[in-house]
Each structure stands twice: as structure tokens, then as C-alpha cells.
């Protein structure tokens, strides 16, 4: 397998998490937690190998690991923690459900937390992570996911809470019911539920994957870091890196946020 790149340094981790946070546009989990996850990977001497989906073997199976829940400061675990690595527990259960080894992981979305989730579990299990995701940014609901758009199933699915619930969804009635199941489990646990779903064949992955987005996260994060180091405008670095436009600028004078139905809500005053 020819890798697009391999992440071995904390500087690469910082660039990737920063870029994913920017491209997540406000969602996608906590970048603080994302950096912590990947720092642990680097500190353990593990490698994060990023691969183009076209480089994987035709019989490969790809799955998507992520968290559903809230990063609102009011969220708290409701019961004692029984499962420390919920994503790994879900990954192991998914492999058992499928009856085969999982070949690679893919980020469900871009964001400081959820992109890091896929990279961490891939490094821990010594499998590659696909250079891409299933959304192209972060989003609050599964409706925006490319798998749903292409009418591909996200089941079977495994959902695990740190409080000890392990739920296997063999099939769901519709995407709204599935979303509700995941949100309810996150509320039941108090903070989040770990999810591993969307087992993709290579043919289906080639339809659904938004290619190159992990590379793009690295590019944007690196551009911002270098702009800061040289005293240049980091916003201009983002605009130039994405061929975008700066619509307005201002200062956030006040903000408040909280949790409603397993989703974070916030209000900003500029």
C-alpha cells in the first residue's frame, strides 16, 4: 500500500486537529479532546497512516467510528464509568458482527474531535485511515452524510456508552429513528455514545467518500500555523488555502451555550 502521508510528530497532530476544527465550521467535537487523543498515539510511538481509498484491496471493509453527543459544559456522566475505550469496544463488536477483519477506518465528518477519533483507533489497531470523510465538514444530523445521500445503509451499527451499554442495531426503520436511538443513548449516558457504523465495500466507498479531506486538514492547519509564526493574518491563510472569501470580521463580545436533546446550542453576541 502506498500511503498519502504518515503522521509521526506532534506538530503534524496540531496541524491536523486545527485544520479539522476550521473545516468543521463549529461542529465535529472538541479539538482539545482530539489533540489529547492523538498526542497519546504519538507518545506511544504509534503511526497514523493515511491512505487513498483507491489504494485499498477490493475485498476491504471500511467502517466509520465517531461520537454522538454534546461538548456542552453542563454535560456529565450519569453513572460510574465501566468502559474506558468505548470506540475500541464498538470496533471489536463490529468486527464480530460482520464476521471479518476491518481493513480501514474513515472519519464520519471533519472536526477537532470526530476526525481524531478515526485516526486514533486506526493507529491503535494498526490499520490505515482513509484520506477523506463522509461529509466534507461537520453537521448536526446524519441526513447530510454522503452515505445517506447515496442511499447506502449505515447498518449494522454498534453503539457503546462508557456507562456499560453495548447496543447492536441490525437494521433501522429510517435515518431519523437511527439518529434518535443514538441521541437517546448519549442522553442516557449523560455525555456521549461511541458509534461504529457504515460498513462499506470498496465500490460503495468510492461513491460516498469525500476524497482528500484529511490532506486538506493538514494543509489548512499548517498554513495557519506558519502564518502565526511569521506574524501574518491566519484568516487570510485560510481564505487563500481554500480559494474562499472573507465576508465580515468582528469580535465575539459574549456567548452562552448549553445542551438540548443531546445537542449543544450556543448564542453569540458580536
Annotate each PLM feature.
Residues 54-103:
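Glycine-rich oxoanion-binding loops at beta->alpha junctions
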Residues 221-270:
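Oxyanion-binding "anion nests"
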Residues 56-73, 144-185:
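A structural-propensity feature for long, helix-poor, extended segments
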Residues 5-42:
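N-terminal phosphate-binding or glycine-rich loops at protein starts, especially the Walker A/P-loop
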Residues 101-111, 128-130:
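A short, small-residue-rich loop immediately preceding and capping a beta-strand
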Residues 163-213:
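Conserved anion/nucleotide-ligand pocket segment
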Residues 123-143:
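Short, acidic/small-residue loops that bind anionic groups at enzyme active sites
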Residues 30-34, 87, 108-120, 136-140:
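Short glycine/serine/threonine-rich phosphate/pyrophosphate-binding segments
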Amino acid at each position: 500500500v502506498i500511503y498519502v502521508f504518515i503522521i509521526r510528530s506532534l506538530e503534524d497532530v496540531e496541524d491536523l486537529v486545527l485544520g479539522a476544527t476550521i473545516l468543521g465550521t463549529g461542529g465535529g467535537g472538541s479539538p482539545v479532546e482530539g489533540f489529547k487523543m492523538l498526542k497519546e498515539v504519538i507518545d506511544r510511538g504509534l503511526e497514523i497512516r493515511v491512505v487513498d481509498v483507491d489504494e485499498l484491496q477490493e475485498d476491504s471493509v471500511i467502517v466509520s467510528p465517531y461520537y454522538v453527543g454534546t461538548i456542552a459544559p453542563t454535560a456529565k456522566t450519569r453513572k460510574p464509568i465501566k468502559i474506558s475505550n468505548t470506540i475500541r469496544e464498538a470496533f471489536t463488536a463490529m468486527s464480530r458482527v460482520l464476521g471479518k477483519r476491518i481493513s480501514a477506518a474513515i472519519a464520519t465528518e471533519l472536526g477537532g474531535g470526530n476526525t481524531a477519533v478515526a485516526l486514533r483507533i486506526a493507529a491503535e489497531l494498526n490499520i490505515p485511515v482513509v484520506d477523506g470523510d463522509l461529509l466534507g465538514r461537520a453537521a448536526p444530523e446524519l441526513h447530510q452524510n454522503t452515505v445517506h445521500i447515496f442511499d447506502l445503509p449505515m447498518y449494522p451499527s454498534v453503539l457503546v456508552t462508557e456507562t456499560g451499554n453495548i447496543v447492536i442495531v441490525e437494521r433501522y426503520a429510517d435515518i431519523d429513528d437511527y439518529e434518535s436511538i443514538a441521541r437517546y443513548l448519549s442522553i442516557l449516558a449523560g455525555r456521549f455514545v461511541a458509534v461504529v457504523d457504515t460498513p462499506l465495500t470498496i465500490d460503495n466507498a468510492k461513491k460516498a467518500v469525500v476524497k482528500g479531506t484529511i490532506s486538506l486538514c493538514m494543509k489548512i492547519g499548517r498554513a495557519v500555523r506558519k502564518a502565526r509564526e511569521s506574524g501574518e493574518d491566519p484568516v487570510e491563510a485560510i481564505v487563500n488555502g481554500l480559494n474562499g472569501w472573507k465576508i465580515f470580521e468582528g469580535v465575539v463580545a459574549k456567548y452562552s451555550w448549553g445542551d438540548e436533546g443531546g445537542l449543544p446550542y450556543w448564542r453569540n453576541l458580536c
